[in-house]
């Protein structure tokens, strides 16, 4: 008989003072990942993991709640300063950035890293509402 196969693994507390916040805001969702300088993930959250479903995931408020959650997780690891990389066309870009600043982080730089095709793939058809 196999017993206690599910063992609770505690996340060890890393002492990292500065990191990079990657805010990816699509038309449907907003994901925020905080990494160290090498790109190793420290904490992450999204509008979907915060309990928003459907079209509510794409709202600025959902991005703000996700940013507050990931900020709390990152501050447990001792993080104080952030560089912010924003990508995507979504509506949660600015509100996520404002929520990170309001959580007490010192934002040293803000970069827009949205990829722009040099006439790559054919875009999807226009919506007719």
From Swiss-Prot:
Keywords in alphabetical order: Ribonucleoprotein, Ribosomal protein, RNA-binding, rRNA-binding
GO BP field: translation
Cystine crosslinks: none
Pfam families in the cross-refs: Ribosomal_S11
Record InterPro entries: Ribosomal_uS11, Ribosomal_uS11_bac-type, Ribosomal_uS11_sf
Gene Ontology cellular-component annotations: ribonucleoprotein complex; ribosome
Gene Ontology molecular-function annotations: rRNA binding; structural constituent of ribosome
NCBIfam families xref list: PRK05309.1, uS11_bact
The protein's name in its UniProt record: Small ribosomal subunit protein uS11
Organism: Rhodopseudomonas palustris (strain ATCC BAA-98 / CGA009)
